């Protein structure tokens, strides 16, 4: 009975162990040099896309509120506001954001059939064409005919990216 009692006390001690702070876990296991954290609160709905430029100085956030917000850590005021907000495609939630590895252009994908590319300051550079939904043989149309679900830049060539859809 005493062995069972000691074992249950050890189990209780193990169960009551404190839950580690997320930042501490990241520092220890991922080797990330984290010293500070902040909360960027400006979207009105759930954030579902983040893009971080290679230097870590700029972040793009996208949301189901249809907006993309650009944050610049070097020039951010103490009120932690984004320096630019825009809606890439009216009434379509943002699905994915990605900065190009070299040029810093921003690939913006939302639940629409047309990918968009913006420059580092959020100015629209390109809107790619939609595929022809009435084409019988889909091999003869270019572009998506339905929602885009994913995409990424080519790792070595900033003039190319790939997208996938439903």
Regions found by a protein language model. Give the residues of each.
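Intrinsically disordered, low-complexity acidic/Ser/Thr/Pro-rich linker and tail segments
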Residues: 1-44, 48-49
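Inter-blade linker and blade-boundary elements of WD-repeat/beta-propeller domains
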Residues: 26-42, 77-93, 123-148
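Beta-strand-rich domains and repeat architectures in extracellular enzymes and scaffolds
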Residues: 39-66
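Loop/turn segments within WD40 beta-propeller blades
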Residues: 50-56, 97-103, 152-158
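Conserved strand-to-loop turn within each blade of WD40 beta-propeller repeats
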Residues: 62-65, 109-112, 120, 164-166
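WD40-repeat beta-propellers
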Residues: 68-74, 116-120
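Solenoidal tandem-repeat scaffolds enriched in leucines and small polar residues
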Residues: 143-166
């Amino acid at each position: 009975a005493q062995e069972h009692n000691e074992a249950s006390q050890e189990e209780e001690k193990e169960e009551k162990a404190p839950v580690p702070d997320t930042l501490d876990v990241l520092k220890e296991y991922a080797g990330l040099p984290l010293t500070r954290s902040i909360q960027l609160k400006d979207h009105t709905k759930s954030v579902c896309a983040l893009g971080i430029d290679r230097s870590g100085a700029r972040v793009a956030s996208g949301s189901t509120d249809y907006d993309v917000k650009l944050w610049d850590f070097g020039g951010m005021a103490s009120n932690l506001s984004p320096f630019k907000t825009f809606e890439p495609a009216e009434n379509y939630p943002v699905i994915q954001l990605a900065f190009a590895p070299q040029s810093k252009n921003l690939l913006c994908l939302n639940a629409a059939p047309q990918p968009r590319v913006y420059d580092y300051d959020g100015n629209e550079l390109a809107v790619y064409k939609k595929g022809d939904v009435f084409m019988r043989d889909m091999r003869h149309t270019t572009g998506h005919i339905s929602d885009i679900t994913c995409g990424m830049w080519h790792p070595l060539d900033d003039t190319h990216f790939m997208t996938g859809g439903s």
